[in-house]
Structures are given as C-alpha cells and as structure tokens.
C-alpha cells in the first residue's frame, strides 16, 4: 500500500509523538504533582492553611488551564528558546505542552487527594505523624489508585 519512504515517515512520526507524549507526561507530573499537593495542603481546610499561597496557585492553575494551547505556544516561545536552545521541533514543543499539562495534572492530583477520608488524616495526626508522613504515606497512599487512574487521562 505504501512505499518504503512513506512507511519510514509514518514510523518516525509515531516515535516523535511517543517521545513528546511521554516526556510531557513525565514533566507535567514533575510540576503538577507538587502543585496539586500544595493546593490541598494550603487550602482553607488543609493541613497548613495559607490563604496567599493557595490563592496564587489557584489563580495560576485556572488561568493557564483556560489559555488556548497555540497562544501559550507563542507567548512562551522566548522561554522555550532559553530552555531548549530553539523554538521549533519536537523537543521545543515539550516545554509549552508541559506548561499547559501541569495545571490539569495539578487539579487531578488535588481532586484525588481531596477524596481521602479526613478521618484517616486525623488518625495519623493523633498518632504524631509529621506533615511529610501524612502527605506521602497517608494522603498519597490512600489516593494511589485514583492517582494511577488519572495518569491514563
């Protein structure tokens, strides 16, 4: 059906797409996971309420999520050039893809962590667990299934 050159272009396109998708997913979680955790922790009813940090993160997540990708691609082109060295190509596209994916991931992480029963968190606090133990062992441990399901989205 296809000649050899067309087949090679399709195969190359598949690998480039996989590269961009996997790199964006990884980098999106590197940025989005801490943002989602911070949103839960600093929320008004969180473990360490902080109105300023919560509001700033909330606004950043909402604003970036509402930006159309092509506009974001153009707006952060100088940043992409600084990070990658050029503003075109698959590697350069990962930067705006990551910056647009991270807020979505942050909201999914926030949603997953908010599903954790508050009684479990209170039990950990009453046993003397520190903040990091509560975050990593209790909250993320309890929300692990939901977080893994969210990776597929």
Give each language-model segment a name.
Residues 18, 22, 131-153:
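Transmembrane alpha-helices
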Residues 10, 14, 18, 56, ...:
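Hydrophobic alpha-helical elements at and bordering transmembrane segments
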Residues 1-5:
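Short membrane-interfacial helix/loop motifs at transmembrane-helix boundaries
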Residues 12-20, 62-65, 69-104:
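Loop-to-helix entry region at the N-terminal start of transmembrane alpha-helices
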Residues 10-41:
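Transmembrane alpha-helix signature in integral membrane proteins
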């Amino acid at each position: 059906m296809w000649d050899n050159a067309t087949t090679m272009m399709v195969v190359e396109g598949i690998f480039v797409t996989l590269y961009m998708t996997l790199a964006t997913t990884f980098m999106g979680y590197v940025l989005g996971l801490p943002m989602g955790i911070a949103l839960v922790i600093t929320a008004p009813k969180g473990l360490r309420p902080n109105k300023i940090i919560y509001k700033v993160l909330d606004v950043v997540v909402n604003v970036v999520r509402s930006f159309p990708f092509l506009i974001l691609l153009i707006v952060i082109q100088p940043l992409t050039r600084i990070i990658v060295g050029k503003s075109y190509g698959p590697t350069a596209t990962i930067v705006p893809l990551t910056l647009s994916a991270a807020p979505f991931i942050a909201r999914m992480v926030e949603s997953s962590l908010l599903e954790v029963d508050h009684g479990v968190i209170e039990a950990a606090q009453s046993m003397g667990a520190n903040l990091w133990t509560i975050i990593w062992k209790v909250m993320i441990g309890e929300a692990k299934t939901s977080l893994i399901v969210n990776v597929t989205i």
